[in-house]
Amino acid sequence: MANNCYNWASIEGSKEMLDLFELRLEEANKEQSHLWWETYFAVLGKPIEEGISYEVFGSRWFHADWERQSETSGVLNGDSAWSPVSEFFRKLSEVYQLEIESEYEECGSDFGGWYNCKNGEVSKDVCTSYHAFRFIQEDTEFFYTLLADIEDDSSWESIDDMDSEFIALLSETQKQELIEAFNKSKNI
């Protein structure tokens, strides 16, 4: 079974292009609940090509949920298989002349990141560890939730097993709090 990668994208564009995108997405979703090889192409309004879905779209499937926010904006989110649908977002931005700001996360495979594009051009493509991503997104709220989780039941054998990208983002005080929570969980 696939690890699900959660994708969230804020999309802006002209009313006409968003109307066309929305229509094509609705048609593709009538056939099945997930976008697959053929339906990715249907949403893009392009003929089916040869290729491997991971390379062409970023993921094998995408359970796309669309919510229109205004005439010129909306949110597209949902799970995909193993990896983000960044390349699909880039293609959407190119076909429909959209500006897309997206985030993705997958705790099981330990990554999260940001991917932005406009009119087919990538402006941001940053991937980091899952804990680092969550800390950057939520700062102290995530940190203290993690501390409570560690104190209750830590699956790490030693503090050295923790994510070094995440640890590097912490202040010295936070590092000390993390060590104390870890030691408490291990009764050290």
Model-derived features with residue positions:
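Intrinsic low-complexity, intrinsically disordered or marginally ordered coil/linker segments
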Residues: M1-I188
